[in-house]
Amino acid sequence: MASKPFSKSFFAFYQFIQRRLGNPPCQHHHRQSTSGVPTYPVIIHGCPLAFQVDDHLQNQALVLDIEGGLLRSSSLFPYFMLVAIEAEVQSRVMVMVCFLGLKEEKVARVARATLPKHFLEDIGREGLEIVRGFKRVVGLSRMIPRIMVEDFLKEYMGLEMVVGREVKMVRGRYVGLLEMESERKLGLEKLEGTEMVGFGSCTGYFSHDYHQLFTCCKEVYLVTPEQKKQWSTLPRDQYPRPLIFHDGRLAFRPTPQATLAMLMWLPLAVHLTVLRTLVFVNLPYSISLPIGSATGITTRVINSPISGNGCTNHGALAQPNQRGHLYVCNHRTLLDPVYISVMLNKKVSAMTYSVSCISELLSPIRTIRLTRNSDEDRRRMEPLLQKGDLVICPEGTTCREPYLLRFSPLFVKLVDEVYPVALMNWSNMFYGTSTGRSKYLDHFYYFMNPHPAYVVQFMERMPTHVVTNGRRCESYEVANMVQSEIGRALGFEPTKLTRKDKYLILAGNEGVVDAKQ
């Protein structure tokens, strides 16, 4: 009789150890299906890359293993590194404690604004083709916490439901520990009575205890590691949803090797960005441009308006009333007007929307804030045009991808003709733009790149008074024409999205920066 309590205790201890260590290879959990009948899934190895989903499977729900059946890379390091850096963990980045001490809203913002770009770049085209063959798809993330991947899977991939690991929280902050599967419910009530098919990789299935959700599937298709190595990168034009807006400072995929290179570059980058800033702020353009080139900055001008003697050569384009020229450009970084000023070899004024006072103090050219009141803004811009040239970015905010936001028609009512300027830039390590509270560091981050590059293309003047079919075009129509011409020169796609749309998507606000920041 005394052996029965011991047997029960030993059996309970054995079950605890088994849950912690996982099942040995080639063994699987035996759990209840959604219908309540215990089942084993049929495992189909070597799922062909040209696997076509027939009509019978379309009516079933696909359980998609995100790491095994969608992403090409098996390394999860870059995604945790992105959360650690973009959520401002500061010194905790060095020890890679990604979630420790972070608030939920900060991690959610990184997952919404930064991670989708890197997930899209890691998607395998072959895996996405299989996902598109199903009307209902449930995403299963075995290793990446749900909060990191849910927004991407629902907003960009259109998945119905996401099941993933949860990170434990204490008093509203993460403690960096993952909850066990037994500590939560799957929440599959919506799939009650629906046949399910699983899709993942062989490596994930046999390397550890597989997720209980796959025991609810009738069949599980597994891709071999050899097949997955042949997966191709998903082209941008095949993204499930266009990637127009994204945030974050890192312009590269933070693999362990790339992250180590960045950390080794940082000490030199800090000194380099200070040097470059001082050069552009304090020295004449004729001196600062060669010095900048010597430090690794690449600048290229197309259709330069500067003649051989260093004077602006607009020739017959000069306006008879001696007013300044209004340059209209797309918006890539805070330095757009500065580069135009450098290429013109003279000081210009720039209209800005919401920039920090630090950026205004460090600007080598005069900046004037727009009030978003058309009458007041027109009143401010008129005297500036009487004194000299003026640069305005009608988009009102930057866009990193090959898209143009809607152009504000304010500039159309000021002058009879405008001078479009098409801008393109490259950053190989850090982005010089942000929607976060550290916008005052934008130009510092841009100058921290080893080889930042800018291309400034001056275009033919365009009239603001346009008549088509006997009707004078409205101001917004003229603004759309200017947008289309710049987009054609750059190969960018014009959109109707605005500054407000960008900040609501990425930051949850309307993008107004406090001048005291």
What are these regions (language model features)?
Residues 49-90:
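Active-site neighborhood of HAD-like aspartate-dependent phosphohydrolases
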Residues 78-98, 105, 249-305, 361-364:
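A transmembrane-helix-recognition feature enriched in membrane-embedded lipid enzymes
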Residues 152-169, 281, 299, 318-375, ...:
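Catalytic core of membrane glycerolipid acyltransferases/transacylases, capturing the structured
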Residues 1-56, 158-164, 180-183, 187, ...:
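Cytosol/nucleoplasm-facing, intrinsically disordered, low-complexity tails
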Residues 43-52, 113-133, 286-325, 374-382:
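A short, well-structured juxtamembrane/interface segment
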